[in-house]
């Protein structure tokens, strides 16, 4: 195994795998991103492929799938001048091709993967991509390509870099080895280290339409292929076209939880404390349910802030609650604080802020 390669054969989990879905390297189809796919293909065919790409867009729209799809295509077609590349309409590679098999198995020789590593001592993923991971991945560029084509580094995602690992990656991108390619997944491109961002070509992926999101969910196979289309459409709409977000809502009774939270928020500044107590009991210690509830609160605040008419004084109470909710939610999870206390405190703040409007 080369430096930085995936751990497919080691039995360790992958931090870049969405729960309930195949890993992006195992995904053979891409929905709703024909424009982005064509831009990569055209650049490669024209012999002007930039050495670093920042694949931006909201989470769950196919950025990592596109990165692996492009890597698979380059491994299968290391020469851009071949008739196969000239005739290609997209970046698809037949499932039986050796490059496709190697990628699906997690052991493509010319690909390094940068992601949060698994801490076997704690049984959890590290919270950041550490500089050691970047150094290991850089070993790929100290060796010759096995197929004579590109050596590719896939980073998923840029938000997980800390300052040291970001600077270590920047050094590689600033002085790229010959025929090297960096595919950097970023959910919030504006937050990427400016010097790193400036050396990448930005490729923004489009939000998925409702139809594309439902098609992508169905293509995941069981159990999602058996879910009623109406439920898939509702989850996709609630997640704003994010496939990963839709999967989040499809777990357990989370759509119902989201609807109940929206009903409580719609009654503000009045608060039904009894119903909130029952809602908090339903969440319990489940972190995913807690994320649904905090997501509903933040989305509601975002919508209200957008309706504020631009008056900073009028928006100030809601903006303060927005910041407090984001900070307190992170602390509640990180420090394993009482989730019910967080919810009661948050709704008290929301009630006070909305009374001031």
Predicted regions and their residues:
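Charged, glycine-rich active-site and insertion segments that engage polyanionic ligands
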Residues: 2-73, 77-102, 178-181, 187-303, ...
């Amino acid at each position: 195994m080369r430096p930085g390669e995936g751990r497919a054969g080691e039995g360790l989990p992958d931090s870049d795998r969405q729960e309930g879905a195949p890993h992006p390297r195992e995904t053979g189809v891409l929905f709703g991103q024909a424009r982005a796919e064509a831009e990569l293909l055209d650049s490669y065919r024209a012999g002007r492929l930039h050495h670093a790409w920042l694949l931006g867009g909201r989470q769950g729209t196919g950025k990592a799938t596109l990165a692996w799809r492009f890597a698979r295509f380059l491994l299968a077609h290391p020469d851009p001048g071949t008739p196969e590349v000239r005739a290609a309409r997209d970046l698809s590679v037949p499932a039986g091709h050796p490059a496709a098999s190697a990628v699906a198995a997690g052991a493509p020789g010319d690909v390094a993967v940068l992601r949060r590593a698994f801490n076997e001592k704690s049984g959890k993923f590290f919270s950041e991509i550490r500089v050691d991971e970047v150094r290991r991945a850089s070993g790929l560029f100290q060796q010759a390509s096995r197929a004579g084509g590109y050596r590719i580094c896939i980073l998923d995602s840029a938000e997980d870099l800390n300052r040291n690992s970001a600077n270590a990656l920047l050094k590689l991108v600033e002085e790229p080895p010959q025929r090297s390619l960096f595919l950097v997944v970023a959910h919030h491109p504006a937050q990427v280290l400016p010097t790193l961002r400036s050396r990448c070509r930005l490729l923004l992926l489009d939000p998925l339409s409702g139809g594309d999101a439902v098609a992508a969910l169905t293509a995941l196979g069981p159990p999602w292929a058996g879910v009623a289309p109406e439920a898939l459409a509702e989850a996709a709409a609630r997640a704003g076209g994010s496939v990963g977000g839709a999967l989040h809502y499809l777990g357990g009774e989370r759509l119902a939880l989201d609807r109940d939270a929206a009903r409580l928020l719609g009654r503000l500044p009045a608060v039904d404390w009894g119903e909130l107590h029952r809602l908090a009991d339903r969440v319990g210690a489940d972190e995913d349910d807690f994320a649904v509830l905090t997501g509903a609160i933040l989305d509601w605040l975002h919508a209200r802030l957008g309706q504020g008419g631009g008056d900073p004084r009028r928006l100030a109470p809601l903006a303060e609650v927005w910041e407090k909710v984001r900070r307190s939610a992170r602390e509640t999870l990180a420090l394993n604080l009482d989730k019910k206390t967080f919810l009661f405190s948050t709704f008290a703040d929301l009630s006070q802020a909305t009374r001031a409007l």
